[in-house]
Amino acid sequence: MVSMHTRRRFLAGLSLAGAAGRVRAPPALAADGALETTTVRIAKIGAICLAPQYVSEELLRAEGFTEIRYVELKDPAAIGQSIGRGEADFSTAFAVDPIQAIDAGAPIVVLAGVHVGCYELVAQPGIHRITELKGKKVAADSPLLLTLMAAQVGLDPANDIHWVTGTDSSFNPLELFADGKIDAFLGFPPNPQELRARHLGQVIVSMAVDRPWSQYFCCMLMGSREYVRNHPVATKRAMRAILKATDLCASEPARVARTIVDRRFTDSYDNALQTLSDVPYDKWREYDAEDTVRFYALRLHDADLIKSTPQKIIAESTDWRFLNELKRELKA
């Protein structure tokens, strides 16, 4: 007998695949050529904002993939390095992640921008701007991003901010903020949504709306250099599925939220729905992915956080061919 969970997953898959068909006309797959491989491995981490890759399974099957694996990474804080080690073939991650990994020699390629603005900087009452974090206790899901934000407004991140960090699983900056033990917290979904649901703190920077951050992609799609080089048709089809799923996140957030909960990528439907409603998933055609790489690479280089120049990273470790083709195929 088919379990209720399996049946729900199957029906949800049919529903999502049908919805994707309504959002975009089916591509002429024959024009791509034959798939070099029918296997693809997608990274699985705890960030709800990566929903497009979590709900792309049926779309990947429609593209001809028969073995689709979601892989738990050994180090979800270093997705680019994990893909470079061969743990997965594709994943989305905050733009700084692949740039750092490329600078360190990871054999990966940045392929597309996916969405804007998932991080929010939340502060205790009385703190209204980043400059007021001087001398304050701060924790961050991405310390590097907060370093760039602080430097952007003239703070010395190393000396002006009291960083609160932890390396074991018991470290929970959200609860530290809730208990008033830190003054600010830079978080990615579902943490900002959880704080909002608990009526804690106030947002002083939202990457979705505040410049300059809102003018660039937050998360970008990367792939294994070996996979992209050896399987160009499979790469394009995998990207097509993920970008179609990105459109679904923008057009049908409630459906996508239910799907990622049913498939146990996250537990809270409310947080998932709030994340999908907050994050702009409708910018992948409009924004320039190369501009995002240049923006973050320049700031990392100026802060002596990477050695490679933006020009070197863009020239050697980005590939926009597939994205440009898909922008023409999947017109809004």
State where each predicted segment sits.
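C-terminal segment of N-terminal export signals and the immediately downstream linker at the start
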Residues: 24-42
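Short beta-strand-to-loop elements that line the ligand-binding cleft
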Residues: 67-75, 92, 157-169
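Bilobed "Venus flytrap"/periplasmic-binding protein-like clamshell domains
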Residues: 37-59, 120-121, 130-197, 290, ...
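Secondary-structure end/capping motifs
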Residues: 229-308
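N-terminal secretory signal peptides and thylakoid transit peptides that target proteins
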Residues: 2-18
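Conserved C-terminal helix/tail region of periplasmic/extracytoplasmic solute-binding proteins
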Residues: 301-332
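Short, polar/charged alpha-helical segment
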Residues: 46-73, 77-78, 82-84, 99-104, ...
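Pocket-lining segment of extracytoplasmic ligand-binding domains
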Residues: 96, 171-262
